[in-house]
Structure formats: structure tokens, C-alpha cells
Amino acid sequence: MPNPTNEELNVATWKIPNALGIIGSSANNEFNGMTASWITQVSMEPLLIAVGIDNKSITHGLMSASEYFSLNLFSENYTKVFVKFSKPAEYKEGFLNEEPITLTENNMPIFDNAIVWFEMRKKETYDLGTHTLYLGEVTDCKTVESDARVAYMGDTRMKYGGVPRGGH
């Protein structure tokens, strides 16, 4: 069987249906939000969610330095937020990149426009090459709109996955 080309690998992996979310992180009074698409539940008891984070990202540094992080999911009709957080975030009290946030008791940003959010305690980390897999145990969550569908990669023009290409 022949080896697939990088283009074939990219096109194939972009077909994997991934939810889009914003990972909220903070450490040492620095805050960030980052668009993420590698998100999945991996255990029911304890309730664990895994997220894949680029090792070169600001979020990776903050998550490595903190015990907690958040996952914020948005409506399929509110996808502009993901473009805002494809670059490092600017924090102004109560806002990240002009998106309103509320800080939890653990100082993690929760996005006010999220339709579902989770706060998680970091349980395990696995360095897997270009990315680190963070396992978080859910400590708090809220569903704001139970009937709304959360956004996924197909709701945007974003493509993330496959093999490294220009700029990554």
C-alpha cells in the first residue's frame, strides 16, 4: 500500500468532525484564550475531557504552569470568536480580545457568550510531539443554551490537523 502524500493526509484529517472551542488559561496574572479543535471526552468516571494544545503556544505555557483550565463552547451562529483567538489574546479587566469573560474562583476565564463551559483541574499531561494532550477533570460546568448546537470546524473556513505546513 503506498504512503499517502501530505496533502492527502491533511484533506483526510480535516474530515474528522471536531468541535471548536476556546481554551481559557491563566497563570501568574497572565490570561489567554485559544481556539482549539482537538477536544474530546475520554472518561465518564471520573469525568475527563482531553484537549490537544500546540507546544509552541502561549496557552501551553500557561496550562503547564497552572492547575486549572477552561473549555468554552459557542453556538454554530457565533463563529467569529474563533478567528479572534487564533492569535494571543489581549486581556483588559473583564475582557479577552474584547470578548466578555468572568473569572472563576481559580482565576480561569469563562466566556460570557459561551453556550456551554467547563472548568477543569489538570489531571495528566502527555507530550505527544508537536502537541501536548491535557486531561482535565471537570470541576464545574454550565449549559446556557441546552437546545443549541455547538460550533464545529465545518461551520468555519478553518482547517487544523494533518501534518505541519507553512507557519506551523
Residue locations for each model-derived region?
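Basic, polyanion-binding surface patches
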Residues: M1-H168
